[in-house]
């Protein structure tokens, strides 16, 4: 049986290099947001946990297990939100895998430069899918912010946290609970979401225009 290339040591090493590169870019892009006391908690959750390079695998693996374990046991709209998170993670993971395959083809070994990253990014020829990914991130953010204002969600999460270890989903439930607590500190999410969308679209279009010479 052929070995799945995405599970090889070299592939996983390059994927971590890619995710570190992207995480560092995210931290540079949103340094001012992270430093703003108003957005301290949500900034820490987004840029240090949601987009951090470490522990991606447990989130990608546990999301599906979480969805299965929660069905019928938690506030329905919360399960819908988790479904959106699963979709976002699957898209992001698929994009990363495509990038890593191109990195291997380009001979990338121990690090990736901005020029290499931009060329590989554009070579995937998936402009519209990247736009969808950005908009889905915004949608997920707004959904979870709305849920953080509902008392029934707090009750559901506390109930699930109690049984999480039994279902083997403690880490991911803790992750989502941290997100809930972070969102709850923000009354109006518009500035955060609008800033994220604007900067991600600018980054996306800048890469495209730099490599292709065309503007969106």
Predicted regions located by residue number:
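Alpha-helical repeat scaffolds in large eukaryotic proteins
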Residues: 19-22, 26, 47, 51, ...
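Short acidic, glycine/proline-enriched loop segments that cap or flank alpha-helices
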Residues: 34, 54, 128-129, 143-152, ...
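Long amphipathic alpha-helical segments with strong coiled-coil/leucine-zipper propensity
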Residues: 43-131, 140
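Charged, amphipathic alpha-helical oligomerization/scaffolding segments
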Residues: 87-94, 132, 136-139, 159, ...
């Amino acid at each position: 049986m052929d070995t799945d290339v995405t599970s090889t040591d070299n592939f996983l090493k390059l994927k971590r290099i890619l995710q570190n590169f992207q995480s560092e870019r995210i931290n540079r892009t949103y340094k001012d947001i992270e430093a703003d006391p108003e957005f301290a908690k949500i900034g820490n959750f987004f840029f240090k946990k949601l987009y951090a390079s470490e522990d991606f695998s447990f989130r990608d693996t546990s999301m599906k297990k979480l969805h299965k374990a929660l069905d019928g046991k938690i506030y329905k709209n919360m399960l819908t939100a988790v479904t959106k998170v699963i979709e976002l993670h699957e898209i992001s993971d698929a994009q990363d895998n495509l990038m890593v395959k191109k990195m291997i083809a380009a001979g990338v070994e121990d690090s990736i430069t901005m020029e290499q990253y931009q060329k590989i990014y554009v070579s995937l020829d998936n402009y519209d899918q990247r736009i969808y990914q950005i908009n889905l991130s915004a949608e997920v953010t707004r959904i979870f912010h709305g849920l953080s204002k509902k008392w029934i969600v707090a009750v559901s999460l506390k109930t699930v946290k109690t049984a999480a270890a039994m279902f083997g989903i403690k880490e991911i439930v803790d992750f989502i609970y941290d997100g809930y607590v972070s969102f709850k500190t923000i009354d109006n999410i518009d500035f955060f979401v609008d800033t994220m969308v604007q900067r991600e679209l600018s980054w996306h279009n800048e890469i495209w225009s730099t490599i292709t010479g065309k503007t969106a």
